C-alpha cells in the first residue's frame, strides 16, 4: 500500500511541478536573457535548452555536469569512457562549465566522440527530444544534480540514471523519509 501511496504522491508532485515550470518559463527566459547581457553565452544556442537541435548518429553516454566544479570531477570519467570507445555528451547549465568543457575536449569534439550541450529545461518534452536526438544509453549525473523532470523523463523513456560523486548522508535520508514528500519518493 505504501508503494501505491508513494506513486500517487509522486504523480501529484509532478503535475504541480510541471505546472509551476509552465508558469515560470517566461521568468526563466527573462533570467537567461538578462544574464546574457553580461555573459552572452547564457542565451547562446537557446534551442538546446528545449531539447531542439540536430539528431546525432549512434548512441551516446550522457554526463550531466551542471557547472565548472562538476565538470572538473567528471573529467576522469569522460576520459575513461572515450578510451573505451563511447561517444559522450556532456551537459551544463552554466557558461563556465560549458566553456571549460569545450576547451578541454576540443580535440575530442572535433573528432566527434564528445559533444557539449546545454542541459534541457526540466520538463518532459525537452528531455524526450534530447534523449531521442542522442539515443542516450544511460546518464551519469555528477554530484546531486538530479531534477524531478529529468528523473521522471528518464524513467518514462527507459534511460537509466546513475549518481556519480554524490552523497546522500544517512541523516538526510532519514529526515527526508519522514516528510510527506521527499526526493526518496521520486
Model-derived features with residue positions:
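Short intrinsically disordered, low-complexity coil segments enriched in acidic
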Residues: 1-3, 118-119
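Active-site and donor-binding regions of nucleotide-sugar-utilizing enzymes
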Residues: 29-186
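Short hydrophobic helices that act as membrane-entry/anchoring signals
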Residues: 2-36
Amino acid at each position: 500500500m505504501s508503494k501505491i501511496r508513494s506513486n500517487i504522491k509522486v504523480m501529484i508532485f509532478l503535475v504541480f511541478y510541471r505546472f509551476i515550470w509552465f508558469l515560470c518559463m517566461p521568468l526563466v527566459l527573462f533570467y537567461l536573457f538578462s544574464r546574457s547581457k553580461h555573459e552572452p553565452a547564457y542565451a547562446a544556442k537557446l534551442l538546446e535548452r528545449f531539447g531542439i537541435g540536430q539528431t546525432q548518429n549512434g548512441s551516446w553516454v550522457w554526463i550531466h555536469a551542471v557547472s565548472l566544479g562538476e565538470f572538473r570531477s567528471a573529467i576522469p570519467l569522460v576520459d575513461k569512457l572515450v578510451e573505451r570507445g563511447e561517444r559522450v555528451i556532456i551537459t551544463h547549465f552554466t557558461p563556465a562549465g560549458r566553456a571549460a568543457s569545450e576547451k578541454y575536449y576540443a580535440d575530442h569534439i572535433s573528432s566527434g566522440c564528445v559533444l557539449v550541450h546545454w542541459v534541457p529545461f526540466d520538463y518532459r518534452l525537452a528531455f524526450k527530444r534530447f534523449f531521442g536526438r542522442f539515443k542516450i544509453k544511460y546518464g551519469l549525473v555528477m554530484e546531486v544534480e538530479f531534477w524531478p523532470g529529468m528523473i521522471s523523463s528518464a524513467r518514462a523513456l527507459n534511460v537509466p540514471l546513475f549518481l556519480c560523486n554524490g552523497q546522500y548522508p544517512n541523516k538526510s535520508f532519514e529526515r527526508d523519509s519522514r516528510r510527506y514528500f521527499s526526493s526518496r519518493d521520486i
